[in-house]
Amino acid sequence: MESWIEVSLNTPAQLSLPLYLPDDETFASFWPGDNASLLAALQNVLRQEHSGYIYLWSREGAGRSHLLHAACAELSQRGDAVGYVPLDKRTWFVPEVLDGMEHLSLVCIDNIECVAGDELWEMAIFDLYNRILESGKTRLLITGDRPPRQLKLGLPDLASRLDWGQIYKLQPLSDEDKLQALQLRARLRGFELPEDVGRFLLKRLDREMRTLFITLDQLDHASITAQRKLTIPFVKEILTL
């Protein structure tokens, strides 16, 4: 079963943002595929003591949120203060939640495309970026569904700022890499996913990794409940395929 890590963030502006991050989305559970250089750059930024900025972009479901969750988990375990702002859930909070985040060790802004054209959010992110530059200590990670220059931002200065740092496209996994990622996730959860079962899932299901991981969790639970090993006939029975 999936569990979650709660991180409480209290900024100097006295705004509290509780973060609920899946505890299985770590660097150890991320299968890089063709993204080894991206992963190395990200981990290097987290190791350094001064500020650093990386922008990651990809289509939805490629793993960019996983990497931000992993970065938050790694620094949280070191005792550092982190902030994670999922802009696809921006109705949960207001732009002022960014006030004071330049004092944190790490700030992660996920799905920036969701606030394109929103003047208040764009200005809040722009101001935070400038404060982070001045502080010289905070690491900033931002994700989007396209390169910075292609975001439909209303604030040209923000588009320019986002284009300053290291920019990486998160490459999609091949089917072979997806199989490896599924088997890795299974091992971390304490069970084995036979290769033939993994290939069957890739053939019969949506190949989007989030869907595959959810299905893997479902099969794990069903296997434990029924006290049966994962086989293709059992998978067909559970998933009614």
Curated annotation (Swiss-Prot):
Belongs to the DnaA family. HdA subfamily. NCBIfam families: DnaA_homol_Hda, PRK08084.1. It comes from Citrobacter koseri (strain ATCC BAA-895 / CDC 4225-83 / SGSC4696). Keywords: DNA replication, DNA replication inhibitor. One of its GO terms (biological process) is negative regulation of DNA-templated DNA replication initiation. It comes from the Bacteria. Mediates the interaction of DNA replication initiator protein DnaA with DNA polymerase subunit beta sliding clamp (dnaN). Stimulates hydrolysis of ATP-DnaA to ADP-DnaA, rendering DnaA inactive for reinitiation, a process called regulatory inhibition of DnaA or RIDA. The active form seems to be an ADP-bound monomer. Forms the RIDA complex (regulatory inactivation of DnaA) of ATP-DnaA, ADP-Hda and the DNA-loaded beta sliding clamp (dnaN). InterPro entries: Chromosome_initiator_DnaA-like, DnaA_dom, Hda, Hda_Enterobact, Hda_lid, P-loop_NTPase. This is DnaA regulatory inactivator Hda. SUPFAM superfamilies: P-loop containing nucleoside triphosphate hydrolases. Pfam families: Bac_DnaA, Hda_lid.
